[in-house]
Amino acid sequence: MIRAVLFDVGGTLHEVHHSPELETSFCQRLLDLLSAHGIALPITAAELAPRLHENAEGYKHWSEQSRLELPGAKIWSEYYLKEFHLSEELLSPMAEELSWMYDAVRVENIPRPNMQETIRTLHREGLKTGIISNIISTTFVPRLLEDYGIADLMSCVILSSTAGVRKPDAAIFEKAAAECGVPCGEMAYVGDTLSRDVLGCRNAGVALSIQISNPSIAHRDTAFTGTGLAPDVLIHDLSEIPGIVRAFNAR
């Protein structure tokens, strides 16, 4: 019996669109924020953008291997801005704002069709809903849920930035289950990746793994091609979820 449906955020509740213009604009805001705190970097926004992308990929690789999420100031100091030798202590006052901007300004987030109504339908049908998200910001997701008008429907919001551990580690799913008061064996999880979401469900013993199609991130799952790892259900629209859960519970 499914009693809770939890969601990933980026790529699941909304699609994430990238562009060189957004990257450069973000880097200019980053430089302006640092300057406002008395830190002047000897680089232009256009020069910083590709370097930041490369550094972020380096951190992503490390975090995916370790399944750990470092504190924001440490990420910016040791990875994202590593060439500039800025200490954690120096970056700490602005680290969260930088991390929030990384997901709010660097990209365009476009809500998926039927997102709010799907979550409201699940809630009306007596199911708990919540979030498990890999993210370096501690404030981006809570602010986003408020903007989407669904914050009050969430029984739990578990972020790697506060948990210190990332999907696909079972621990982050178990933390969400404990906070929702529902065991993993009575939980469904909706995400867009095999490598983090579907594998995480398998690791934690989540009852129902639902993957929503997202071709833009397929390259991150190439290592799992041909391994047999697959979701219980693949969907193309969030509105499919209530019916899937009803059918599961009717078995």
Residue ranges with predicted function:
Residues 56-70, 102-113, 166-172, 207-208:
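Short amphipathic alpha-helical segments at helix boundaries and their inter-helical linkers
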Residues 9-10, 16, 21-63:
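Conserved phosphoryl-transfer catalytic core
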Residues 99-101, 158-159:
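Short beta-strands and strand-loop turn motifs
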Residues 21-31, 68-78, 135-136:
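Short acidic alpha-helix initiation/capping motifs at coil-to-helix transition points
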Residues 67-74, 89-93, 100-129:
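Short, acidic loop-to-helix structural element flanking the phosphoryl-transfer center
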Residues 1-5, 15-17, 21, 39-43, ...:
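Asp-based, Mg2+/Mn2+-dependent phosphohydrolase catalytic module
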Residues 45-99:
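A metal-dependent, Asp-based hydrolase signature
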